[in-house]
Design a protein with these regions (language model features):
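Bacterial N-terminal signal peptides
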Residues: 17-29
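Short, intrinsically disordered low-complexity segments
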Residues: 12-14, 38
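Preference for long, amphipathic alpha-helical scaffolds in soluble/luminal domains
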Residues: 33-395
Length: 395
């Protein structure tokens, strides 16, 4: 990885491109995500993916058209299947495109959530019914859930109702039974980025308290405070972010969604009236927005070191992961007026170009679908839903 945006010698660029092409071949075998059309070479893609020259700022109309092309292909041109992929990959597709996201089962296309909620088999989707609610088990590797409440957080971001039925070991439960288990599984030191999303989305009023497995009283604000760190210790807060999964973006996304949900239930509270964990979350979010903008590369890509420092890379996968995850966070954290600023438009344009140039490459699922989710959120917030989204909702 290079930490500089200066021009790289041609020989070094070629060597990095060759190394990447080998890595991408192995990535297709181990972590590829969907059957993409064949053709083209990774070499041509890579030498443009890390180009240091300043990127033009697309017009709003140009960007909307580019977004729609990229999202249409990513949703429908890349197809995942129950035979080739596990819950870790398939649920990332749901994260990007919502509860109607379709996958292959044999020769047929099925709705991923309908399939698994009906109790049909999906590798890595392992639920256990307990007296304290339905628990999604954590599993090693990229098969099953990798973090507490990850599956439920994905589902919650698409406003799937808590009354939705879900079959576990032949018995019918409801999504709220998973929420109940999330409330029970709170303790000091828990990685709560996904729990913040779940509980801030489903609990009304958001200020309610409950007793968790540790026998102590908990609230959404207490979970948020644990994730955000000390209110006025910005160095400690930055360290918490930088040490977290995917450059801190998941922690920040959890904080941003929770704060958005709190504001939705308390529109009378202005930013300068926030207190406790909500104020700490606000401070961490504003810090990260500044870092993302200050460390952005001339190409429009966000730093491959996320919020720590400026960094560029010859590795296409690193750019996809960093810019995709960072845009996803910003799309939750920024209002429409700020998302429409040139610096964000350049990042969106960069990400669209990267995905257009890699249409023939079977990309790693996590980076691909977090990037797609960021683009979906941006498209919806700045321009409104795509026509295909409106048609699906109408049906």
């Amino acid at each position: 990885m290079s930490d500089s945006s200066h021009e790289t010698p041609a020989s070094a660029r070629f060597g990095a491109a060759v190394a990447l092409s080998v890595a991408l071949v192995h990535g297709v075998i181990l972590t590829g995500c969907g059957d993409a059309p064949s053709g083209g070479s990774g070499l041509a893609v890579q030498t443009t993916a890390a180009a240091p020259q300043p990127a033009p700022t697309p017009t709003p109309d140009q960007l909307r058209e580019q977004l729609d092309r990229v999202l249409e292909f990513t949703e429908h041109g890349r197809v995942m299947s129950l035979e080739k992929h596990a819950a870790w990959q398939l649920l990332h597709g749901v994260l990007a495109f919502g509860p109607n996201f379709r996958i292959k089962s044999g020769d047929q296309m099925v709705v991923a959530l309908d399939w698994v909620f009906a109790g049909k088999p999906m590798r890595g989707w392992t639920l256990t019914a307990t007296e304290y609610g339905v628990k999604a088990e954590i599993e090693p590797g990229k098969l099953g859930q990798g973090h507490d409440d990850q599956w439920l957080a994905i589902i919650s971001q698409w406003q799937v109702p808590a009354t939705r039925e879900i079959v576990v070991a032949g018995q019918t439960y409801r999504l709220r039974d998973m929420v109940k288990r999330s409330m029970y599984d709170c303790w000091n030191g828990k990685e709560a980025s996904w729990s913040d999303i779940v509980l801030s989305t489903h609990l009304r009023p958001i200020d309610q308290t409950w007793t968790a497995r540790d026998g102590r009283e908990w609230s959404v604000e207490r979970l948020v405070s644990m994730e955000a760190g000390p209110i006025y210790d910005d160095d400690a807060g930055a360290e918490l972010i930088n040490m977290s999964a995917c450059g801190g973006t998941h922690r920040l996304i959890g904080l941003a969604i929770a704060l958005n949900n709190y504001r939705s239930q308390h529109p009378e509270i202005a930013d300068d009236q926030l207190a406790g964990g909500w104020l700490a979350a606000h401070r961490r979010i504003q810090w990260a927005i500044r870092q993302a903008r200050d460390f952005q590369n001339p190409s429009g890509a966000f730093s491959t070191q996320f919020f720590q420092r400026s960094a560029n890379s010859a590795n296409l996968d690193e750019h996809l992961a960093a810019t995709g995850h960072t845009l996803e966070f910003l799309s939750f954290a920024l209002p429409k007026s700020e998302l429409d600023q040139p610096w964000v438009r350049r990042a969106v344009g960069y990400l669209c170009r990267l995905l257009e140039r890699t249409r023939h490459i079977d990309l790693e699922c996590g980076a691909l679908y977090h990037a797609a989710h960021g683009l979906v959120l941006y498209r919806m917030k700045v321009y409104g839903p795509r026509e295909t989204d409106v048609a699906v909702a109408a049906n």
